[in-house]
A protein has these predicted regions:
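Proteins with a high burden of low-complexity, intrinsically disordered sequence enriched in S/T/G/P/A and R
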Residues: 2-4, 56, 83-85
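Terminal low-complexity, poorly structured segments
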Residues: 1, 26-28, 77
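N-terminal beta-strand motif that seeds the catalytic metal site of vicinal oxygen chelate
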Residues: 1-21, 50, 64-67
Length: 85
């Protein structure tokens, strides 16, 4: 018997303090496509995984990464991101 969520699509929730600034960063700097938007969240497609950027009123930064990408050349990727920022 398959697991309940075995074939379900994952959507990750990322808290942000400024929804429009986050949208600009994920769309313009990271190059992700916006798939949905409302007053409370913006959803971007990260190569098939949906990231829901959700505005929260009391954002407490954490000392760990909440999302990461595996890339073939980290130095080239950093250079490309810096050039877009």
């Amino acid at each position: 018997m398959p697991l309940v969520l075995e074939n379900a699509e994952l959507i990750a929730f990322i808290p942000v303090s400024n929804l429009q600034a986050a949208r600009r960063f994920y769309e313009s700097t990271l190059g992700l496509r916006v798939t949905d938007e409302n007053l409370f969240a913006v959803v971007v497609d990260a190569n098939g995984t949906m990231l829901r950027l959700t505005e929260v009123t009391d954002l407490t930064p954490q000392p760990f990464t909440i999302a990461g990408w595996q890339v073939p050349d980290i130095d080239a990727t950093i250079d490309a991101l810096v050039a877009r920022a």
